[in-house]
């Protein structure tokens, strides 16, 4: 355990270093720390011995080590902090006409990436927690059709498919009837379970040959099990990490799994400093924050960047964008649920 003065010295070195990326000497600290230069140097030496500071090769100053940044995050960083200077810019950046949910999530990801210079990832509500609230089948031609699904009474998902060769018109009607009777209004998690248990038994009552029918169910509903992911600033990862991180960001489903695992049960926010179980994220910092998607649940807003990032400003921006995005989404869903002509 370090002393209060040593904690203050570490915090100040972290703050100064993340702003200038230059080693910090005792003279710079003496302007804020009410102690002699010798006392400060002695404390810096102790912090270095503990592995929280590193000595620069080109000067007598010190800089935080990865362990030092981690100590700062765990003991001094407020995860709910907000810098009012950034609020106006974020609100102004969100001043645009959104025609669908994805527009707002993509915009939020771009704003966070542009304001930090790092990589931003936004996830929609976890698929398992969404509900199937609407389903229809539209026959496009003699040989193909479109499954039109609605999640949470607001999010459309469409899947085009080739009609199985042995299907008649009544078979498409039966397919739709089974969905409406057994799957409609259920969660995506329930649908996944029923496709493996109930549906194979039900299909036998309606169809002579069931193999292609079960394959059709799997094909149509597999889209619901995928995360909706918005990545911005992927190329920025090359400035603070190696090619493995850049390539990892292409695998959006795996990215989503890793980010969800970074939050413990019940946590609303977390900061990992070189602490991810994913090898491609093991040498970077990952900030993760839940934000409200009204009427539906929580999305995930994440920032991936270097270990020596400005944590206070990064946390502030994540919080501000999360709050502004939640407000924007609230307006959007209220509009969807209102009488169009009453609104105007």
From Swiss-Prot:
The keyword Transcription applies. InterPro entries: GAF-like_dom_sf (IPR029016), HrcA (IPR002571), HrcA_C (IPR021153), WH-like_DNA-bd_sf (IPR036388), WH_DNA-bd_sf (IPR036390), WHTH_HrcA_DNA-bd (IPR005104), WHTH_transcript_rep_HrcA_IDD (IPR023120). GO terms for molecular function: DNA binding. The keyword Chloroplast does not apply. HAMAP family: HrcA. Belongs to the HrcA family. This is Heat-inducible transcription repressor HrcA. It comes from Streptococcus agalactiae serotype Ia (strain ATCC 27591 / A909 / CDC SS700). The gene is hrcA.
């Amino acid at each position: 355990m370090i002393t209060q003065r040593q904690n203050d010295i570490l915090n100040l070195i972290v703050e100064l270093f993340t702003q200038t990326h230059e080693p910090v000497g005792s003279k710079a600290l003496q302007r804020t720390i009410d102690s002699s230069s010798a006392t400060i140097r002695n404390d810096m030496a102790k912090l270095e011995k503990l592995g929280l500071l590193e000595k620069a090769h080109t000067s007598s100053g010190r800089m935080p080590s990865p362990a030092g940044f981690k100590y700062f995050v765990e003991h001094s960083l407020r995860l709910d902090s907000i810098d009012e200077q950034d609020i106006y810019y974020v609100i102004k950046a969100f001043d645009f006409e959104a025609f669908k949910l994805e527009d707002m999530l993509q915009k939020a990801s771009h704003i966070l990436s542009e304001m930090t210079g790092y990589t931003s990832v936004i996830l929609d509500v976890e698929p398992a927690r969404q509900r199937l609230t609407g389903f229809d089948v539209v026959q496009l031609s003699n040989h193909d059709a479109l499954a039109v699904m609605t999640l949470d009474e607001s999010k459309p998902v469409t899947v085009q498919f080739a009609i199985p060769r042995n299907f008649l018109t009544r078979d498409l009607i039966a397919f739709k009837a089974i969905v409406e009777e057994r799957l409609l209004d259920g969660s995506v998690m329930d649908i996944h379970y029923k496709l493996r248990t109930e549906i194979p038994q039900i299909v036998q009552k309606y169809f002579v040959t069931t193999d292609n029918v079960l394959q059709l169910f799997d094909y149509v509903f597999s889209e619901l099990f995928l995360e909706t992911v918005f990545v911005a600033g992927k190329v920025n990862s090359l400035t603070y990490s190696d090619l493995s991180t850049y390539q990892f960001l292409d695998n959006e489903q795996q990215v989503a799994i890793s980010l969800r695992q970074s939050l413990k049960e019940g946590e609303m926010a977390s900061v990992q400093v070189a602490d991810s179980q994913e090898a491609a994220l093991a040498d970077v910092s990952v900030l993760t924050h839940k934000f409200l998607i009204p009427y539906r649940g929580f999305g995930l807003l994440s920032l991936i960047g270097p270990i020596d990032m400005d944590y206070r400003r990064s946390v502030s921006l994540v919080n501000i964008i999360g709050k502004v995005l939640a407000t924007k989404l609230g307006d959007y869903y209220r509009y969807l649920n209102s009488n169009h002509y009453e609104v105007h």
